[in-house]
Amino acid sequence: MKLCLLALGAAVAAAPTATLANGDTITGLNAIVNEKFLGIPFAEPPVGTLRFKPPVPYSASLNGQQFTSYGPSCMQMNPMGSFEDTLPKNARHLVLQSKIFQVVLPNDEDCLTINVIRPPGTRASAGLPVMLWIFGGGFELGGSSLFPGDQMVAKSVLMGKPVIHVSMNYRVASWGFLAGPDIQNEGSGNAGLHDQRLAMQWVADNIAGFGGDPSKVTIYGESAGSMSTFVHLVWNDGDNTYNGKPLFRAAIMQSGCMVPSDPVDGTYGTEIYNQVVASAGCGSASDKLACLRGLSQDTLYQATSDTPGVLAYPSLRLSYLPRPDGTFITDDMYALVRDGKYAHVPVIIGDQNDEGTLFGLSSLNVTTDAQARAYFKQSFIHASDAEIDTLMAAYTSDITQGSPFDTGIFNAITPQFKRISALLGDLAFTLARRYFLNYYQGGTKYSFLSKQLSGLPVLGTFHGNDIIWQDYLVGSGSVIYNNAFIAFANDLDPNKAGLWTNWPTYTSSSQSGNNLMQINGLGLYTGKDNFRPDAYSALFSNPPSFFV
């Protein structure tokens, strides 16, 4: 009996292994509740002459190596600046502790690694569905270690619908999304997206050796990760194949879809490039890109952090973000979805009810109608005076109509805060989702809207709170962000999770029936996606007017 117990203990404690497509066998970590392979390199270090360029697949042998801890996150920038000092005291702690706005340490330029978490005892022949996560962070910060996926895998086992969870690091800020004519002419735009795409190709090549099915991959992400997920739908005008097979069969987008951005060589991207060049001391160099590539990691970090962060004024006018490059992103993203140039896969897309409140906090100096108009003019340089007038009429200074929504006269910490918060949330997230759904005809569509924190002062159901329920807590939100997503990855139908409220498919925002799953602190219910029609018309009658 003792020998049997010893043998059983040894079997339980045995380190898991996986064999890659090239025949290399690697070892992971037995965490009892799951098995982890962490920090596997999928690309050559993007340093030196490879800085800012699309990634090069990793070529060295990994045979016999152990992968038991996360690799360093990619280099990031400070998203706050002096923003922390302007936060109201009752919102400061929540914002600063929000996972989406934390710089993930340690970080390094040699960072392009991938992680695989699978249920315990998974055999190579298991053929499990795969959930491939893309983290958020405003394209300026973040890392795969912050959103580990452990809860997703554990919950999938309890549901009897086991999945393998994959996450990757990708370059952010200037390292991944530097723009400008020099970058465009070299063909190096959107390097961070190329990192993500190469990681997807790594999954296609290797996930079968871990027990995953490469034909059952669901890509998903939150915030910048959600926008990235959308971009992969329209990448190459919707051709998502690799070696003749689709890289993914479904997509989930949590807060984000089309990116309202000018091309790589557009005005604002070029302005940011010039700021980095000047701050780095490369302004007089004959080859400015070569000069930037010759900088130390710390010097480039300082120059990058001198540019406006995601929470700087004017908020959400991001310094670094995906931009049309004419090759992989062939047009503006609204045009691509309108023209049907996307991969045809089932999708889930949803938002938090008060997506804009976090970002509205950076504009507390705007207190009058005149200042609000000037703020909109500064933020949207392509918009005509008439379009700004229409925007001002759609988003009035009536505090009962602003965000946090449905809070009446409360939470108006300045006369313009709720107005600006409503507009920012709708443009980047909530009503952009409606635009996507109205045009996307690529497969079955499901949509959600969370009001789970509607009573939270100042912030309401703020951007990024879904990650708390998805990775760390249990509640009605986690029923969607875990159970329903797991069912979708397995069966392409979130209702297979046994939800107590049937999740209707989405046809159009003008349909007569309920088409939106809504989440609150008490549970799940359905509703109509027909709110704020005047705001929708003001923002999306001519989307390029509001590009950055």
Curated annotation (Swiss-Prot):
Pfam short name (any one): COesterase
EC class: hydrolase
Keyword tags: Disulfide bond, Glycoprotein, Hydrolase, Lipid degradation, Lipid metabolism, Signal
Gene Ontology terms: biological process: lipid catabolic process
Coiled coil: none
Molecular function in Gene Ontology: triacylglycerol lipase activity
Keyword Cytoplasm part of the UniProt annotation: no
S-S bonds: 74-111, 282-291
Keyword Hydrolase: yes
Catalytic activity: a triacylglycerol + H2O = a diacylglycerol + a fatty acid + H(+)
Secretion signal span: 1-14
This protein's name: Lipase 2
